[in-house]
Amino acid sequence: MIIAGFQSGHDVGYCLLKDGVPIIHEELERFIREKEPLGDGLDMLFQRLPDVDLENISHFSYGNPGGMLGKWADRCGKKEPRDKMNKLISQNDGKFFIIGHHQSHAANAFFSSNYDEALIITIDGSGTDKKDWNDVTSEATIDNSFSTAFTFWKGKGLDIEPIERIPMQKITIGSPWRIYTREIFGLSSGHPYGLAAGTVMAMASVGDSEKYWKDFYNSFKAGGGGPSSHTMENCRKYKPIADKSEQDAFDVAAGIQKATEVIAKEIMSPYIEKYNPKHICMSGGVVLNSVMVGKMYDWYPNVEQIYVCPVPYDGGLAIGSAQYVYHQILRNPRVEWKDNTSPYLGNLYTEDDINSALSKYENKIEITDSSDEDVVELLTEQNIISVFGGGSESGRRALGNRSILCDPRSPDMKSIVNEKVKHRQWFRPFAPSILRESVKDWFYKDVDSPYMTTVLDWKEEVKDKVPAVVHLNGTARLQTVTENDNKWYYNFIKRFEDKTGVPIVLNTSFNDREPIVETPEHAINCFMGTNIDYLYFYDLKLLICKKKV
């Protein structure tokens, strides 16, 4: 059984779910090379899969009822599938479903996990849900829907059921964050460069969080989803402060981060105390705040694991809506994941695809047959190496298939990569990819973080061994790696450990101020335009370097 899910508006994309397993998930930004573009996910499906046979797709799902659905006449590629979809939508013969925004987030969080029972929490800026959450066929209207930004669900077996859906008029965290990022710090807050909230989080880690947090707390409580009076007043008050000096900007950022943590804990605690879950599943754009997720282990010591799905922001609505249809509506059994659901859902590129891309640069590059062992050796010689293989990662994080890798033992590597490759601020941290079985030896908490969603404290006695992946406050947003997660990457880190005694490599996304590279040609373009030393196509064992002029 194949179900097609799609997301339109921003974070545009589509997915195909086969027998409950996502087999492909692609986002528009990876192909047009601009972050957070507006568009139509169904049109993207037809453009990317022009030969798709709609008769082979059992059901369609749309996880954003607040988007204008309407007819697809002017938006979908070929006439035949376009006409079929218009007929499906108008007649809705049991094949087309419109799932609530947070309902889709919750489904993605729970059904992507291995838990039979969990408390599900979704947090974002805002999203449209239907008042009757069992209504999965009608479009959202003013009368049948409302906007929420913080919801709680009970997940058990094949079902998720709402416990509480808090209207955004009472609380919203995501919307003020977007406004503060732009208005106070002058950073990008959307298309074409993406939301730079991660930069603000990095700043917050070296600021004084006690100075300003109460004003920002009040703006989150004001809700409303847009530029509320509290939010705009804070912009007017704190922009001049942030402009004074770098440290002042850090202090303002720290206030925003602390306010986020205080209000999130305040809202979550009654539900966690009441239900006392062993497992929490989370989704929604705000849970990309990995600092908050990491602190939840301190707040709630009885919780064994906090699971954040690979695509928690709105790009994951395509996956979540399809999962909801497959499990909760059609009553198909859960999927047992080997350790974790795979985030490597992008297209697989052939040897011909790679050679064709390389041929365009044949006068500028040298190509040699290589091996993983050779690449590990190059890492230990302090080279910066980009890797490309398998399907690209879904989500915001590169997890070994579209990554830039470095030796974490180098005290200079962080500044080198920030300045010469990523072209970003000096204080931005880099993530450690660590063998799952080694986490307990390096961090104070021994938990899973397969999609780089959790910030933890390094153990004092070992952090000096890997200075390139230790943030200024002694933390890291780690990626835990098992052999089932990514066999090639796991074995590569193992080889690095065998040579150095360190089961960790520095991992950052293979890009330079653009979306993560998707195609072989994107990879070569990025490689040629930066100070990356080598590009390694690990499936073919091809090592690329630039010809010396």
Where are these regions (language model features)?
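Phosphate/ATP-binding catalytic cores across multiple sugar-kinase/actin-like superfamilies
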Residues: 254-278
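Short beta-strand-loop/turn "lid" adjacent to the catalytic site in phosphate-handling enzymes
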Residues: 51-89, 107-108
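Phosphate/pyrophosphate-binding loops at sites that engage ATP/ADP/AMP, CoA/4′-phosphopantetheine
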Residues: 43-58, 267-276
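Active-site cores of enzymes that catalyze phosphoryl transfer or operate on phosphate-rich substrates
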Residues: 202-258
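Short glycine-rich phosphate-binding loop at a beta-alpha junction
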Residues: 54-67, 276-285, 386
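Flexible beta->alpha loop and helix N-cap segments adjacent to enzyme active/binding sites
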Residues: 7-35, 82-94, 101-107, 111-219, ...
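Extreme N-terminal starter segment of soluble prokaryotic enzymes
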Residues: 1-4
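Active-site pocket-shaping loop/turn-to-helix segments
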Residues: 29-39, 251-254, 258
